[in-house]
């Protein structure tokens, strides 16, 4: 089950990353596909390795907000752990079939399909840290590393700046120019 979940998420992530890339960034289909597969696996496994010299802080990548959102999702899914993912999948299946579609089981047994306490604590903590980190990154870096981004790009880059240091270590901003408050927030 773990292998199926891992490969499914990584393959979907690789396809989405590949589709988010511009054709001019790589010399040929296979180089682009290798980049997509490598970064999907690296993000889901929370490794943070990149094949690019400056990480994702390269001209063709630091403004690719779709790529950043895909990597954020992979980072979060990989960081949650398999028991949480399985619990979420079971709950989602139950909620979709019973609550939304109204499908009733022919079996007359009661099974409480709820998110476990572990799942709830993990999800609440993960998204709370992500939200607080995004807001603080956005505020402290608005007139610094986020200056070159506009509109929704500032928010996505702040979200990426909050999600990545907790688990993987990808970067889409120049880490050497971060303000002191951002560095302190990132450390803790």
What are these regions (language model features)?
Residues 1-188:
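Membrane-proximal intracellular helices of multi-pass ion channels
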